[in-house]
Amino acid sequence: LRKNMRPEERRLWYDFLKDYPVRFLRQKVIDGYIVDFYCASAKIAIELDGSQHYTQAGVEYDEERDRLLQAWGIEVIRFPNDVLRDKFEETCRYIDQIVTSKIKSTNRK
């Protein structure tokens, strides 16, 4: 686990997820993998991707990791760091829409 959040993680956490009405956790370990943010009630993992995620090794690692998380029923949502920086409000609205939709569909079951 990292003690210090990257600037994009810090902004998403302190400016949106920390006080979001549905609980999110930071740096959640799931089956040996650490996700940036996790919402158990919506079964969503949010990942903020820096440049290392776009190398061949990074892409392969992320694909393997996403498959494992999906096997647990967790939807992985990825945002490139630059999208979070450039379109923060839109990113937050998108996260809200997904969480709301997932919780509604879970409650209907």
Question: What is each of the regions a protein language model found here?
Answer:
Residues 1-109:
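Nucleic-acid endo/exonuclease domains
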